């Protein structure tokens, strides 16, 4: 039993050039001794600047990605398959399933900035923890069926997802507001819902992991 996971439309991106000269962005960058466009977009720091961006309510939440990776990767469990991040601007990031994400948020942000600037972390390592792949989301369709977790999807019990098979890639949205992009809608083979209530990204992952481990007889 392996669960392949992809975080979809993830709110993980560098500060776009359109707002790089905004005082809020410059102030944060100076504190960290970095160029504004080399810092991660974060709505808690860049709220006033972001209001000028298209689709801004769906952007600037790298903490969602951080929590999701912590939930899926921290424990040494036998169900971890392939892990990917699909970003809101269409990048596909491969995540080594042996990675132990830093629990400290600021350390994670540093890693994410390095990743988005240089294409992988660590830089020039033959076995990177995370790497931007030169592919599109549609390219993953040749390897997987894609099942998207959505509150409007087909009602299933979490344990049913554990038994789909390793040719399935489970997609969980990693953004705060809004709907999946047309890119996601174009590749989804099936939509699943595991609750009658709206769940946050890390809650969805937690429920699936717990259900799968229970099937395996883990305490």
From Swiss-Prot:
Organism placement in taxonomy: Archaea, Thermoproteota, Thermoprotei, Sulfolobales, Sulfolobaceae
Assembly notes: Homodimer.
Residues of the site described as Interaction with substrate rRNA: 61, 100, 103, 107
Annotated family: Belongs to the class IV-like SAM-binding methyltransferase superfamily. RNA methyltransferase NEP1 family.
BP-aspect Gene Ontology terms: rRNA base methylation
GO molecular function, one term: rRNA (pseudouridine) methyltransferase activity
Alphabetized UniProt keyword annotations: Methyltransferase, Ribosome biogenesis, RNA-binding, rRNA processing, rRNA-binding, S-adenosyl-L-methionine, Transferase
Gene: nep1
Family matches, as CDD domains: Nep1-like
Described purpose of this protein according to its UniProt entry: Methyltransferase involved in ribosomal biogenesis. Specifically catalyzes the N1-methylation of the pseudouridine corresponding to position 914 in M.jannaschii 16S rRNA.
Record-given protein name: Ribosomal RNA small subunit methyltransferase Nep1
Enzymatic reactions: a pseudouridine in rRNA + S-adenosyl-L-methionine = an N(1)-methylpseudouridine in rRNA + S-adenosyl-L-homocysteine + H(+)
Site positions (Stabilizes Arg-61): 63
Binding site for S-adenosyl-L-methionine: 173, 178, 194-199
EC number, UniProt record: 2.1.1.-
UniProt xrefs under SUPFAM superfamilies: alpha/beta knot
Gene3D superfamilies for the chain: 3.40.1280.10
Parts of the chain that traverse the membrane: none
